[in-house]
Amino acid sequence: MRIIMGLMKSLVFGPEEGDVDDLRRKYGLPPSQFITLSNGVIIHLRDEGESEDPVIVLVHGHSEDLHTWDRLAKHLIGSFRVIRFDLRRHGLTGPAPDNEYSIESYVSDLSMVIKHLGIDNFVLVGHSMGGRISVKYTIENREKVDGLILLSASGAPRKEKTP
């Protein structure tokens, strides 16, 4: 029964920070990288391909991680510099110190990842919740986004209920 309760807790609340550290040591091998953003979030990312190639940034959906893109990334690397990362409380990124999980916080993390990597322009691809994050990022940073690709993107929240 304890095992079932522990699994349910992890599914609902995500892993504890200590659990994430163990997972990072076991699964965070190259080409994985970890960067600490100015807000204290430790982001797990992969930056693959040649630095002079056009950049494509892949943003996964809710309850996914950067491995969602493994098959696609395999085909893109060689023609593109492929950036993918785990959103906060997903994959090996773990929980955020501020315990904030709004779309705005995810967009802010995306902005900081882009800045940290020194990327000027790129194509942005978002799936599910990652699509919503990508749309909001693009609206706020049009000068950086050369193209936006949405795959089964979640919609924007409604201010009024549908009758």
Question: What are these language model-derived features?
Answer:
Residues 135-140, 146-163:
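Flexible "cap/lid" loop of the alpha/beta hydrolase fold
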Residues 73, 114, 137-138:
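A conserved amphipathic alpha-helix that caps or lines the catalytic cleft of carbohydrate-
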Residues 41, 47-92:
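Conserved HGGG/HGGXW glycine-rich cap/lid loop of the alpha/beta-hydrolase fold
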Residues 33, 38-39, 46, 87-125:
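Active-site loop/oxyanion-hole signature of alpha/beta-hydrolase fold enzymes
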Residues 126, 130, 134:
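Gly/Ala-rich beta-loop-alpha elbow adjacent to hydrolase catalytic centers
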Residues 68-70, 93-99, 159-161:
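Conserved catalytic-core motifs of eukaryotic protein kinase domains, centered on the activation segment
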Residues 1-56, 79-80, 120:
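Alpha/beta-hydrolase fold catalytic core
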